Regions:
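Conserved catalytic core of the tyrosine transesterase superfamily
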Residues: 1-337
Length: 337
């Protein structure tokens, strides 16, 4: 740490490198999500307050500032639940800072006491099967970059993995064969093994033989253009690139497609195919089936909309008389006041 670092910078460093991993025993992925929240907070300070990361002190970390950050984040298009997750991370940091900077315990406690906003039942955003197919097949597999991007999009959908799980896949996690399996390192440091489709298996086999034949088991399956481990921002960029490309030709294609939407789409398509919700729970790596039930509710809502859409057609098929043809009756009805 630089000798000129502020107390805020020092606390952030200790929070991420000591407190979370060693005292709270949080997983690497959880720590990364906390890091991302703090990066967003610093970006907010720079863009909205013209405060550089090197100029903020722990005494400046106040309730009003955090609330402004959350409003800025919501205005960027984030959901209430996403904002609540960011708030939870900042409150954990505030709790830690109280232990280290007791002289600022009062303003820090006011941050910890910010209440999360209540959100309506979560709406599941997903692509239809045809939309997903269009997106996955967009990259040009005749180039190395396009082939790599095709693998990323295909694997993210077919495995239903979280984006960080995709980043963490190593060569050893893939077991190619008549039935190809993939081992995923999920939340809570838990692993699950899933079966991939034959088409995805063939794509990965070709990708490894063409571009990753030199790789050993501990090497990452997906790398960035610098042949380093790809990160979540890199995958988000790839998704946006092809969505924007499609929308140049098809403005009806959804504009806001995020990485987690691949996971939502896979779950919805499995449900539509009649796959048991318990299997979907295990496939997605949900600890509690209530988390998976959000897809069941969404599927029921779609079915209800389909039924309602058919209702006018059924009514229109009934041979009701055309009262306009009976001028006398129409005049009589119009004369009633």
């Amino acid at each position: 740490m630089n000798m000129n670092s502020t107390d805020f910078a020092c606390l952030v460093t200790k929070f991420l490198t000591e407190y979370l991993p060693h005292h709270r025993c949080y997983s690497k992925n959880t720590i990364l999500s906390y890091r991302d929240t703090l990066k967003l907070f610093l970006r907010f300070l720079k863009e909205e307050k013209d405060i550089s990361p090197n100029s903020i002190y722990i005494k400046d970390f106040k309730r009003e500032l955090v609330i402004e950050f959350l409003e800025w984040y919501r205005n960027s298009g984030a959901s209430i639940s996403a904002a609540n997750q960011r708030l939870a991370a900042l409150k954990t940091f505030s709790d830690y800072a109280q232990l280290e900077s007791i002289e600022y315990i009062a303003p820090l406690q006011s941050v910890s006491n910010i209440k999360a906003k209540k959100s309506s039942p979560k709406e599941v955003s997903f692509l239809t099967a045809s939309q997903m197919s269009k997106l996955i097949n967009r990259p040009d597999i005749n180039t190395y970059t396009g082939f790599r991007h095709r693998v990323i999009l295909t694997l993210m959908y077919d495995s239903g993995c979280r984006v960080q799980e995709l980043c963490d896949i190593t060569i050893a996690d893939i077991s190619l064969g008549s039935i190809t399996t993939l081992r995923l390192h999920g939340k809570g440091n838990k692993y699950r093994t899933i079966v991939l489709s034959d088409a995805t298996s063939k794509l990965i086999e070709n990708y490894i033989s063409r571009y990753r034949s030199y790789a050993v088991g501990t090497d990452y399956l997906i790398t960035n253009r610098y042949h380093q481990k790809i990160d979540r921002d890199g995958i988000s960029y790839i998704v946006k690139k092809y969505v924007d490309d499609i929308r140049k030709e098809d403005t009806a294609f959804p504009e806001h497609v995020h990485c987690h939407m691949f996971r939502h789409s896979k779950a919805m398509h499995m449900l539509e195919a009649g796959i048991n919700v318990v299997y979907i729970r295990d496939f997605l790596g949900h600890e509690d089936i209530s988390t998976t039930m959000v897809y069941v509710r969404a599927d029921n809502r779609l079915k209800n909309e389909a039924i309602n859409a058919l209702a006018p057609k059924i009514t229109n098929e009934v041979n009701l008389p055309d009262w306009n043809k009976d001028k006398d009756l129409l005049e009589f009805l119009n004369s009633l006041k």
